[in-house]
């Protein structure tokens, strides 16, 4: 896992600005598994009209790419087969997770253990043949404007936009 971040904050009495960028890059302990996330944020707050009006706006962008994140439950989860793999068996036997079936003219999954009523599959097959990729793009924008009419009365308005796009691919 690698995490990197940088931020910048600057300002005066009437104007403050903040910007940051961060990245998380990791490869899981499950083979062929990875997660990458990048965050970018900027925010500015300023006052004017003798400090009676305040304008605050910000923007964030998040890009996330992941591959073969472990499914929950028993279906398509490599951990189920790994946990229930008989101790008397040898892992090197199943690391060659596919065999060529001449009659069908395709490679088929090699999993001599069976499914034990739990839809178990060879963990290597799941990680190298049942590929899942996910790409998420998200951006958020916000702005606020307030005006101090009297010392005890302020009028304010805010707007926020949150938009995301998710592109998910699963290959069997």
Short names for language-model regions:
Residues 12-13, 49-51, 148-150:
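Outer-membrane beta-barrel channels and translocator barrels
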Residues 1, 29-33, 39, 43-138, ...:
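Surface-exposed loop/interface segments of Gram-negative outer-membrane beta-barrel transport/assembly proteins
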Residues 1-7, 17-33:
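Short strand-turn segments of transmembrane beta-barrel domains in outer membranes
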Residues 153:
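An active-site-proximal structural segment forming one wall of the substrate-binding cleft
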Residues 9-10, 22, 160-161:
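Non-cytosolic beta-sheet module surface loops
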């Amino acid at each position: 896992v690698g995490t990197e971040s940088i931020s910048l904050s600057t300002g005066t009495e009437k104007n403050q600005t903040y910007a940051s960028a961060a990245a998380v890059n990791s490869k899981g302990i499950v083979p062929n598994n990875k997660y990458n996330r990048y965050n970018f944020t900027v925010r500015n707050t300023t006052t004017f009209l003798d400090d009676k009006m305040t304008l605050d706006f910000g923007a964030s962008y998040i890009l996330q790419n992941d591959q073969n994140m472990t499914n929950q439950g028993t279906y398509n989860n490599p951990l189920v087969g790994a946990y229930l793999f008989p101790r008397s068996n040898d892992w090197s036997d199943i690391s060659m997770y596919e065999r060529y079936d001449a009659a069908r003219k395709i490679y088929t999954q090699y999993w001599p253990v069976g499914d034990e009523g739990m839809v178990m599959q060879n963990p290597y097959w799941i990680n190298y043949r049942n590929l899942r990729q996910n790409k998420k793009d998200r951006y958020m924008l916000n702005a606020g404007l307030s005006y101090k009419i009297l010392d005890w009365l302020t009028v304010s308005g805010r707007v926020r936009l949150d938009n995301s796009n998710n592109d998910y691919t699963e290959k069997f």
